[in-house]
Every structure is written in structure tokens, then in C-alpha cells.
Amino acid sequence: MAVRGANTLTSFSIQAILNKKEERGGLAAPEGRPAPGGTAASVAAAPAVCCWRLFGERDAGALGGAEDSLLASPAGTRTAAGRTAESPEGWDSDSALSEENESRRRCADARGASGAGLAGGSLSLGQPVCELAASKDLEEEAAGRSDSEMSASVSGDRSPRTEDDGVGPRGAHVSALCSGAGGGGGSGPAGVAEEEEEPAAPKPRKKRSRAAFSHAQVFELERRFNHQRYLSGPERADLAASLKLTETQVKIWFQNRRYKTKRRQMAADLLASAPAAKKVAVKVLVRDDQRQYLPGEVLRPPSLLPLQPSYYYPYYCLPGWALSTCAAAAGTQ
């Protein structure tokens, strides 16, 4: 299997990996597969052999003719000196088994694939039928490979697919991102307008300083207010100019003065409409010009007689016997 470049054919790295696996197992190279170190000419004749391996439609004579053509080519004569078809030990071990040659081969595959993609699109469009069949055969054999061999085989197929990223799902994703970016750019002014529509945080209002009027200004304003409660525009302008004030100051003073007058009037109306307090006649017991006690009574010493219950008990708290005693004493008097 080969990748067609701009001018030359470059062998595929999967072939070298398979040959290396067979060499480690001590197996002979199959008749339809070129030995390691095969050149572009040897790979060019591989379609017929691989088609025979897949479909079994070619005979030994055709296979022998293919081998004769391989040996007859200049590259075949150069590589056939150190190997035979039956002995793996005679193969060239420096062809594609080292990591350096493997990396060079991958770079060559990438360059060839990019050239093929630029010239005619994808690599899969220009592959022959036998190469497609061989690739299917390799996919069937890849089931028993190790992880390292699978990664090496996949690395050779990545470069041609990069040209078709714009067509596949990844390309659709990129186009969607681009369209989304374009839509976002188109909706940018709308987003800015929405942000502008949002109400800003209310700024704290600066406390306005009160205007200090002089006594002369207050006197003139009071005199004009008693004469005229409301001022027109020209009258307010003349009064402000005469008092060296602004029209706004004069207007605010008249508004406050009217409100103050209205509150006073409302308070007076409430007092007038309130019912009068009820008057009650109270007997005057003590007068300022009269004495309550005589001078002799105040200086009299207390009597030594035992106190009656009526003296140290309130009338409503006296017991029954005390009440009867008091009643009897009152009756005797």
C-alpha cells in the first residue's frame, strides 16, 4: 500500500510494522508482500499481488511474473542482492525498522498526503480498488496488534484527513463557532443597549444648603407677603433683583411662607371647633386669709386617755363591736 505524492510514491509505514512483526515471529514473508526495504518501484507492482491475496484470482504464473518484474527493475536488482524470498534473515534490516527511518517515512507520508489533498482533494478519492481491498485486509489483521503498533498505524492516516476538516463534523463545528462568533458580534450593540437600559444605582443626593437671609431681606419679604400672597414671574424677578436674591430663592421662600400660614390657620380652626371644658363648682375649704387651727389647739398636749377604736381604725374598717360602741356613745351624747 502506498501514498501517492506530488511526483513519487512513498511506501506506507504499516507495511514496515507488519514485516517487523513477522520477522520477530520467525515467519517467512508472504509471497504477495514486499520485504522490508522495498522501494517505490517494488510498491508500484504491489497492487496485483495484494489483489491476488484478497480475491485469490491470480495464479502462480502471474505471481511469478510479478516477481520477475520486481527483480528486473533497477531498484529490485539493488535490493535483491542481500535477501531471498524464503529467508527473513537475508532482508535488509536498516530499511524501515529503526525509529529514525520510521519518522522520516511518516514525514514523507504527510508531505505526500498534503500534496495529494491540494491537487485532487482527499486521498481516498484517488486510491485504486486493489489498494482499498488491501486496506480492508490490513484492518482485519489489526485486531491482534498491540497499542504501540495501532498508534503507529493511525499516525500515518492523520495527515490526509486534516484537509477535509472543513467538510466533516469537526468542520461543521468550526463553522458553527464562526457563525456564533459572527452572531455575537452582530448582537454586540444590542447587548450594549440592554446594559445601558439597566437602571444605574441611585447616587446619594447632595444635601442642599439653606439660604441665610438677612434681617432686611426677611423684613421686605414679609411685608410683600402680607400685601400679596402670590407673585407673577415679572414681579418675582423685580423683587429678587431688589433684594439681590435669585428668583428660585424668592419662589421657595413664598412657598414655605404660604405653607406655614396654612398650618397656623388649621391649628386655630381646630382649637375653635373643640368643645369647651365642663365647669364644676367646687366648695373652697381652705382660704388663704383664714387659719385652720387656733393657737391654743396646736400647742395642746395629747390626751392620756386610751384611744377609742374610732381613732386608730378607719370608719369603713371598724369591727362590729367597735361600731356598736360608737353608736352607743353617740346615743348618750
Curated annotation (Swiss-Prot):
It is found in: Nucleus. Coiled coil: none annotated. GO terms for biological process: animal organ formation; cell differentiation; determination of left/right symmetry; embryonic skeletal system development; intestinal epithelial cell development; middle ear morphogenesis; negative regulation of apoptotic process; negative regulation of chondrocyte differentiation. Disulfide bonds: none annotated. This is Homeobox protein Nkx-3.2. It comes from the Eukaryota. It is linked to Spondylo-megaepiphyseal-metaphyseal dysplasia: A skeletal dysplasia characterized by disproportionate short stature with a short and stiff neck and trunk, relatively long limbs that may show flexion contractures of the distal joints, delayed and impaired ossification of the vertebral bodies, the presence of large epiphyseal ossification centers and wide growth plates in the long tubular bones, and numerous pseudoepiphyses of the short tubular bones in hands and feet.
